[in-house]
Amino acid sequence: MESRVLLRATANVVGIPKLRRPIGAIHRQFSTASSSSFSVKPIGGIGEGANLISGRQLRPILLLDSSAINGGEKREILKPVKAAAAEGGDTAGDAKVGFLAKYPWLVTGFFFFMWYFLNVIFNILNKKIYNYFPYPYFVSVIHLFVGVVYCLISWSVGLPKRAPIDSNLLKVLIPVAVCHALGHVTSNVSFAAVAVSFTHTIKALEPFFNAAASQFIMGQSIPITLWLSLAPVVLGVAMASLTELSFNWLGFISAMISNISFTYRSIFSKKAMTDMDSTNVYAYISIIALFVCIPPAIIVEGPKLLNHGFADAIAKVGMTKFISDLFWVGMFYHLYNQLATNTLERVAPLTHAVGNVLKRVFVIGFSIVIFGNKISTQTGIGTGIAIAGVAMYSIIKAKIEEEKRQGKKA
């Protein structure tokens, strides 16, 4: 900006011949020049925007009239002007590209890493809590409560700015939040009842329920290729369930209810499409889901917690560790869900779908290593087949969605 203003300031001085006199002559001639030999010329008007730098007006300066100074003197005067213009061009004209802007794949890779890392840590810490505090309804409330407090603090400092909500948007978000709450609680009931790896194997069936709901409830036509890709998922889950050493019906049925709940959440989410950003939408859903989860937690687990639940947990690990575990598991739960949303915004649906499958592989693998869960050969093979089927389904579905978008653009 400064270079453009300075160059414009010199526009009134024209016809620069070769240098004939030394610069000292300028001062002698200027001191003897009559008052008519020079005039005051402001550099452009405010309306033209020529005198504004960073919102401040430049003070008018005295420019010697062409009759008062010969060509050589003009050239000497213009030297510092040109030098300043060149210096300004070097600093303001050539904006350096930031490191992160130059290598966006590093940022995306960091998002994927943090998404996986937080998800694995959440699942491990969550299961450790259930080993000494088997109250999934209460823990589910803590997950949402910590996330809601985090959102409220973020809103208070304007990161992000809270988006206003009206009664119409609230009506469409309530069904989404109810399904989110039900799916979250039943997932935790399953995590508490069986091995983490088995729960995630059962939850691999979620795409099957999504396809079934789209076909038979929403009336959407599902290509045969998608149905065929789901066959290995069903087969793999069946194989893993038959020989799972930690199998029990509470864990199995709870994971299946979670799949159905999250399927309906997806259906209601499509009906609740809004211009609000995903961070604010997730915050409002978390707040509503928290109020949905509190009553059943009080009814189902309240008396047990007051009688001996809290006391037993504190006796086993101590008050400080008990409270810190609940706080951090809630933070990890909220942050990994937020990172999943942020990652989806940075990559194509196909990349995110593959990443989601790999995330489940990471969680299953790490849970087996950390907790030393013994699995049979058939369970391992069944889990592998189910994950491969989910990968096939995710890739095919993402390609179909991309073709639809390209068709709409054309």
Swiss-Prot record:
What molecular functions are annotated in GO for this chain? phosphoglycerate transmembrane transporter activity; triose-phosphate transmembrane transporter activity
Q: Which domain of life is it from?
A: Eukaryota
The entry summarizes the disruption phenotype as follows:
No visible phenotype under normal growth condition, but strong reduction of triose phosphate export from the chloroplast and reduced photosynthetic acclimation.
Q: Where is the transit peptide?
A: 1-82
Q: Where is this chain primarily localised?
A: plastid
Q: Does the keyword Endoplasmic reticulum apply?
A: no
Give the induction note.
Answer: Expressed with a circadian rhythm showing an increase during the day and a decrease at night under long day conditions.
Q: Which stretches are transmembrane?
A: 105-125, 138-158, 172-192, 222-242, 244-264, 281-301, 313-333, 361-381
Query: Which subcellular locations apply to this protein?
Result: Plastid, Chloroplast membrane
**How is this protein positioned relative to the membrane?**
Multi-pass membrane protein
Question: What Gene Ontology terms for biological process does this UniProt record contain?
Answer: phosphoglycerate transmembrane transport; photosynthetic acclimation; triose phosphate transmembrane transport
Q: Which GO terms describe its cellular component?
A: chloroplast membrane
Q: In which tissues does this protein get expressed?
A: Expressed in shoots, leaves and flowers.
Q: Which Pfam families match?
A: TPT
Q: Does the keyword field hold Chloroplast?
A: yes
Question: Which sequence positions carry the modification called N-acetylalanine?
Answer: A83
| Keywords carried by this UniProt record | Acetylation, Chloroplast, Membrane, Plastid, Sugar transport, Transit peptide, Transmembrane, Transmembrane helix, Transport
Family as reported in the entry's similarity comment: Belongs to the TPT transporter family. TPT (TC 2.A.7.9) subfamily.
Report the protein's function.
Triose phosphate/phosphate translocator that transports inorganic phosphate, 3-phosphoglycerate (3-PGA) and triose phosphate. Functions in the export of photoassimilates from chloroplasts during the day. In the light, triose phosphates are exported from the chloroplast stroma in counter exchange with inorganic phosphate (Pi), generated during sucrose biosynthesis in the cytosol. Involved in photosynthetic acclimation, a light response resulting in increased tolerance to high-intensity light.
Q: What is this protein called?
A: Triose phosphate/phosphate translocator TPT, chloroplastic
Biological source species: Arabidopsis thaliana (Mouse-ear cress)
Q: What is the lineage of its organism?
A: Eukaryota, Viridiplantae, Streptophyta, Embryophyta, Tracheophyta
